[in-house]
Amino acid sequence: MAPKAEKKPAAKKPAEEEPAAEKAEKAPAGKKPKAEKRLPAGKGEKGSGEGKKAGRKKAKKSVETYKIYIFKVLKQVHPDIGISSKAMSIMNSFINDIFEKLAGESAKLARYNKKPTITSREIQTAVRLVLPGELAKHAVSEGTKAVTKFTSS
C-alpha cells in the first residue's frame, strides 16, 4: 500500500501542474495581461508589501488590550503572584465587556437627555447603573479621583 500512496502524490503533482499550465495557456488570449499586472504587483508588494503587511500587522497590533495594565495592577496588589495567559485573556475580555456596557449605557443616557456629548456625568451614571452596590461606589470614587488628577495636571 505504501507504493500506491507514493504513486498518488506523484500522480497528483503533475496533475496539479498541468491545470496551472493550461490556465497559463488559456489566459494569454485576454486575461493574462490582467493576471500579469496583478501578479507582479503582488510580487512587488511582497517586497515592499512586507512594509504594507507589516503596516497591516501594526494595524492589527493596535487592537487595544489591557494586558499590561492588568499585570501592573496584579503586581501592585500581589507582587509575588503570576497570571496565566488564559486567565489574562479572560480578564481582558471581561474589561472589554464592561467597557462596552458602560459605553452603551452612557450613550443611551446622552440620547435620553438629547445631548450630543457623553460627559463624565453620563459615565458616572452608567457606572452606577451597570455595576452593583459597593463596587459602583468604589468605581465612582476612583473615577472622580482620576478625573480630578487629570484636570489638575
From Swiss-Prot:
N6-acetyllysine carried by residues: K7, K37
Any one annotated GO CC term: nucleosome
This protein's UniProt keywords: Acetylation, Chromosome, DNA-binding, Isopeptide bond, Nucleosome core, Nucleus, Ubl conjugation
Disulfide bonds: none
InterPro entries to which the protein is assigned, alphabetical: Histone-fold (IPR009072), Histone_H2A/H2B/H3 (IPR007125), Histone_H2B (IPR000558), HISTONE_H2B_site (IPR055333)
Residue numbers spanned by region Disordered: 1-61
Subcellular location: Nucleus; Chromosome
Function description: Core component of nucleosome. Nucleosomes wrap and compact DNA into chromatin, limiting DNA accessibility to the cellular machineries which require DNA as a template. Histones thereby play a central role in transcription regulation, DNA repair, DNA replication and chromosomal stability. DNA accessibility is regulated via a complex set of post-translational modifications of histones, also called histone code, and nucleosome remodeling.
Similarity-based family: Belongs to the histone H2B family.
PANTHER family: HISTONE H2B
Protein name as it appears in the record: Histone H2B.8
Species this chain originates from: Oryza sativa subsp. indica
